[in-house]
Protein backbone atom coordinates (compact mmCIF):
# COMPACT_ATOMS: atom_id res chain seq x y z
CA UNK A 1 0.00 0.00 0.00
CA UNK A 2 2.73 2.48 0.96
CA UNK A 3 4.88 1.33 -1.94
CA UNK A 4 2.08 1.87 -4.43
CA UNK A 5 1.50 5.35 -3.03
CA UNK A 6 5.21 6.13 -3.27
CA UNK A 7 5.58 6.60 0.50
CA UNK A 8 9.07 5.18 0.63
CA UNK A 9 10.09 7.22 3.68
CA UNK A 10 7.20 5.68 5.60
CA UNK A 11 8.36 2.22 4.53
CA UNK A 12 11.87 3.04 5.75
CA UNK A 13 10.52 4.12 9.15
CA UNK A 14 8.49 0.91 9.33
CA UNK A 15 11.54 -1.22 8.65
CA UNK A 16 13.52 0.67 11.29
CA UNK A 17 10.80 0.42 13.94
CA UNK A 18 10.19 -3.27 13.27
CA UNK A 19 13.91 -4.02 13.39
CA UNK A 20 14.27 -2.23 16.72
CA UNK A 21 11.24 -3.95 18.25
CA UNK A 22 12.35 -7.34 16.99
CA UNK A 23 15.89 -6.77 18.24
CA UNK A 24 14.63 -5.92 21.73
CA UNK A 25 12.50 -9.08 21.67
CA UNK A 26 15.53 -11.04 20.41
CA UNK A 27 17.76 -9.81 23.23
CA UNK A 28 15.16 -10.50 25.94
CA UNK A 29 14.32 -13.98 24.72
CA UNK A 30 17.93 -14.69 23.77
CA UNK A 31 18.96 -14.03 27.38
CA UNK A 32 16.11 -16.20 28.67
CA UNK A 33 16.95 -19.08 26.33
CA UNK A 34 20.68 -18.73 27.01
CA UNK A 35 20.31 -18.95 30.78
CA UNK A 36 17.13 -21.01 31.19
CA UNK A 37 16.88 -22.97 27.94
CA UNK A 38 18.08 -26.15 29.60
CA UNK A 39 14.87 -26.16 31.66
CA UNK A 40 12.86 -26.40 28.45
CA UNK A 41 14.63 -29.63 27.56
CA UNK A 42 12.70 -31.41 30.30
CA UNK A 43 9.49 -30.75 28.40
CA UNK A 44 10.74 -32.80 25.45
CA UNK A 45 12.97 -35.45 27.03
CA UNK A 46 11.15 -38.09 29.08
CA UNK A 47 14.17 -39.05 31.14
CA UNK A 48 16.77 -36.76 32.62
CA UNK A 49 19.62 -37.93 30.43
CA UNK A 50 22.54 -35.70 31.31
CA UNK A 51 24.24 -36.16 27.95
CA UNK A 52 21.14 -35.13 25.98
CA UNK A 53 20.44 -32.21 28.29
CA UNK A 54 24.05 -31.06 27.92
CA UNK A 55 23.97 -31.26 24.12
CA UNK A 56 20.65 -29.43 23.92
CA UNK A 57 22.00 -26.75 26.25
CA UNK A 58 24.96 -26.16 23.90
CA UNK A 59 22.60 -25.90 20.92
CA UNK A 60 20.22 -23.51 22.72
CA UNK A 61 23.10 -21.25 23.76
CA UNK A 62 24.44 -21.19 20.19
CA UNK A 63 21.15 -20.15 18.60
CA UNK A 64 20.16 -17.76 21.41
CA UNK A 65 23.19 -15.60 20.66
CA UNK A 66 21.98 -15.09 17.09
CA UNK A 67 18.31 -14.17 17.47
CA UNK A 68 19.00 -10.65 16.14
CA UNK A 69 20.20 -11.88 12.72
CA UNK A 70 17.18 -14.20 12.66
CA UNK A 71 14.97 -11.17 13.33
CA UNK A 72 16.64 -9.31 10.45
CA UNK A 73 15.97 -12.26 8.14
CA UNK A 74 12.29 -12.37 9.09
CA UNK A 75 11.71 -8.61 8.90
CA UNK A 76 13.63 -7.87 5.72
CA UNK A 77 12.66 -10.99 3.76
CA UNK A 78 8.96 -10.34 4.30
CA UNK A 79 9.30 -6.57 3.98
CA UNK A 80 11.16 -6.71 0.67
CA UNK A 81 8.65 -9.23 -0.62
CA UNK A 82 5.85 -6.90 0.46
CA UNK A 83 7.48 -4.10 -1.53
CA UNK A 84 6.93 -6.14 -4.67
CA UNK A 85 10.33 -7.77 -5.02
CA UNK A 86 9.48 -11.47 -4.99
CA UNK A 87 12.67 -12.91 -6.45
CA UNK A 88 15.19 -11.09 -4.23
CA UNK A 89 14.04 -12.61 -0.91
CA UNK A 90 14.17 -16.05 -2.49
CA UNK A 91 17.89 -15.58 -3.11
CA UNK A 92 18.30 -15.03 0.64
CA UNK A 93 16.92 -18.53 1.11
CA UNK A 94 19.63 -19.78 -1.22
CA UNK A 95 22.22 -17.88 0.87
CA UNK A 96 20.82 -19.55 3.99
CA UNK A 97 21.10 -22.96 2.38
CA UNK A 98 24.68 -22.24 1.28
CA UNK A 99 25.69 -20.97 4.73
CA UNK A 100 24.09 -23.90 6.51
CA UNK A 101 25.55 -26.43 4.08
CA UNK A 102 29.05 -24.96 4.13
CA UNK A 103 29.07 -24.86 7.93
CA UNK A 104 27.79 -28.44 8.17
CA UNK A 105 30.45 -29.71 5.76
CA UNK A 106 33.27 -27.97 7.65
CA UNK A 107 31.89 -28.98 11.06
CA UNK A 108 31.40 -32.61 10.07
CA UNK A 109 34.94 -32.72 8.66
CA UNK A 110 36.22 -31.71 12.10
CA UNK A 111 33.58 -33.81 13.89
CA UNK A 112 32.47 -30.67 15.70
CA UNK A 113 29.09 -30.69 17.42
CA UNK A 114 29.54 -26.99 18.19
CA UNK A 115 30.07 -26.34 14.49
CA UNK A 116 26.86 -28.18 13.64
CA UNK A 117 25.05 -26.10 16.27
CA UNK A 118 26.31 -22.96 14.55
CA UNK A 119 25.00 -23.97 11.11
CA UNK A 120 21.68 -22.15 11.52
CA UNK A 121 23.23 -18.98 12.99
CA UNK A 122 25.73 -18.86 10.10
CA UNK A 123 22.81 -19.27 7.68
CA UNK A 124 20.99 -16.38 9.36
CA UNK A 125 24.08 -14.18 9.10
CA UNK A 126 24.52 -14.98 5.39
CA UNK A 127 20.87 -14.28 4.64
CA UNK A 128 20.64 -11.14 6.80
CA UNK A 129 23.75 -9.65 5.16
CA UNK A 130 22.28 -10.28 1.71
CA UNK A 131 18.84 -8.95 2.68
CA UNK A 132 20.29 -5.78 4.23
CA UNK A 133 22.32 -5.16 1.07
CA UNK A 134 19.15 -5.65 -1.00
CA UNK A 135 17.14 -3.32 1.24
CA UNK A 136 19.70 -0.50 1.11
CA UNK A 137 20.07 -0.99 -2.64
CA UNK A 138 16.32 -0.67 -3.14
CA UNK A 139 16.10 2.38 -0.87
CA UNK A 140 19.04 4.08 -2.60
CA UNK A 141 17.34 3.50 -5.94
CA UNK A 142 14.24 5.33 -4.69
CA UNK A 143 16.30 8.13 -3.12
CA UNK A 144 18.18 8.73 -6.38
CA UNK A 145 14.91 8.77 -8.30
CA UNK A 146 13.53 11.38 -5.90
CA UNK A 147 10.75 9.08 -4.70
CA UNK A 148 11.67 9.30 -1.03
CA UNK A 149 8.69 11.10 0.44
CA UNK A 150 6.17 10.70 3.28
Name each region found by the language model.
Residues 67-93:
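Membrane-interface junctions at transmembrane-helix termini in multi-pass inner-membrane proteins
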Amino acid sequence: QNMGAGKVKRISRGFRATTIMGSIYSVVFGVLVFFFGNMLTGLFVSENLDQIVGLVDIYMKCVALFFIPLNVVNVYRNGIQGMGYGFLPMTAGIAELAGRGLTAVVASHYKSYLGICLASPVAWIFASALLLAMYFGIMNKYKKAGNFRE
